[in-house]
Amino acid sequence: GQMSAWYVLSSLGMYEAEPAGGRYWFGSPLFDRAEVTVPGGVFTITAENNSAANKYIQRVWLNGQPYTKPWIGHADLMKGGELIFEMGPEEKVWYCPDEPEAYADQRPAEEQRLFKSEAVEGEIARVCGLLTNERLRWMFANCFPNTLDTTVHYGEDEAGNPDTYVYTGDIPAMWLRDSGAQVWPYVQLCKEDPALQKMIAGVIRRQLKLINIDPYANAFNVAPTGAHNKTDFPQADPMVFERKWEIDSHCYPLRLAHHYWKTTGDTSVFGAEWVEAMHNIVKTLKEQQMKEDPGDYTFLRTTDRQLDTRCHVGRGNPVKPVGLIVSAFRPSDDATTFGFLVPSNFMAVTSLRKAAEILTAVNGERELAAECTALADEVAGALQQYAVVEHPEFGKIYAFEVDGFGSAQLMDDANVPSLLAMPYLGDVER
C-alpha cells in the first residue's frame, strides 16, 4: 500500500523524499492531468505543455495563487484543490528557499560560548558589512563562529603546551578529519589573535598525539574513557572512539599543520611528537599499499548497516598491489567497496609533499622527507595509471574507487575529500 502510493504520487510529480516527513517534493510529472480523491474532496494536478521536451517545471500555482515552495505539505494535499505545473524545455530555479520567520541570533549566550576570539568577531562584522543579502548575512554570522562557540575545548598539557580537543559537533569525540576542517577557516586570522593561534596550535598538538596512540583510528575520546561501539572487533585502545582506517585521517592534520606554519611561521608544534607521528604515518600508508600482505588491520562491527563494517572477515575486498593506498573507509565513515579510494589517494600525495617540506625546512629530517616524497611520487604515478577510466559519454574520468584489477566504482561521496572537492583541496588543478 505505502509503496503503491509512493509510485502514484511520484508519477504525478510529488516525491516523499523524507519518509513520514509530511512533505512531497516536486519533480517532473508523467501526465498532463490527473485527479486524486482525498478526504477533502478532489486534488487535481495539471501539467501544462507537458512533454518529453518540456520536462522542467517553470512555475507552480496552488488553488489559483503563485506557489514558491519546492514541496507541498500532506495537509494541503488532503484538503483538495488544484495544483498547476507550467512546464518548459529548460531547467529553472522557480522556487524560493524556506525563509525563517525572523533572522534571530542562533549563537549560544556569550557566557556559554566555549572559546572567544576578537579576530573572529571582527571578521564576522567585516563580512556581514559586505553582504547585502539578509539571509546570507544571518547564515554567516551564525555559522562561521559555530566551531568556537560549541565544539572547541582549549587547555594545556602537563608541560604547559596548548592542547585543544574539538568535538565533531553532536558527538563528544574528536575526528582527525573533522577537527582539521573545523578550525581551518580560522587559521587566516591567527596573526591578529594570539589566543586563537594558541588554540589552533593545540589542535595540531592533540592530533599528533592521537595519531601516535593509534595511527589506524579515525576518532578519539578526550581521555581513556573506553567510549566506543562495544560490538567492534578487535576492541581498541580506551582512548579510541572509533578505529575506522581512513587515509584522510592522516591527511587533514598534515594539511592543517602546513597551513598553520605557512601562515604564522610558528615551528613550536613540530617537535619530537611531530617527527614520531610522521614515522607512524609513513609506516601506516606503506602498510596499506599491501605490497607484501594484507597487513594486520581488520575491522568488524555488529550492525544492520552494510557499510558500517567490512566484508571478508574485516579485511575488505581484495586489491592488486599497484602502489595505491587502501582506505578501509570513506570520509563518510562508510566502508569502501574497492579499497583504493581515489580522492583520498590524491589528498595523500599533496599532504605527503607538504609534510616533506616541513620535515626538511624545520626539522632537518631529510631522510624521512625523502620517504614522504618518494611515496607521494609513487602514488601519483599509480593514480594516473589505475584511477583513470573511460566513460562512454565523457571520455577519460577519475573513478571514485578502484581495486587495481580493473574494477571501478563510478560515483562520488558527500564528504571531503571527494572527486568534486579535489580542486578545492588543491589536489588537482581546476
What is the predicted function of each stretch?
Residues 172-200, 204-307:
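Aromatic-rich carbohydrate-recognition surfaces in CAZymes
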Residues 7-15, 143, 206, 210, ...:
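Generic, well-ordered alpha-helical scaffold segments in large soluble proteins
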Residues 1-108:
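Non-catalytic C-terminal accessory modules of carbohydrate-active enzymes
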Residues 1-30, 89, 231-238, 243-246, ...:
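C-terminal capping/lid segments that line or modulate ligand- or cofactor-binding pockets
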Residues 108-177:
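Low-complexity, Ser/Thr/Pro/Gly-enriched N-terminal "stalk/linker" regions
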Residues 145-162, 225-233, 318-330:
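Active-site-adjacent bridging/hinge elements
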Residues 9-14, 119-132, 181-194, 252-267, ...:
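Well-ordered alpha-helical scaffold segments within catalytic/enzyme domains
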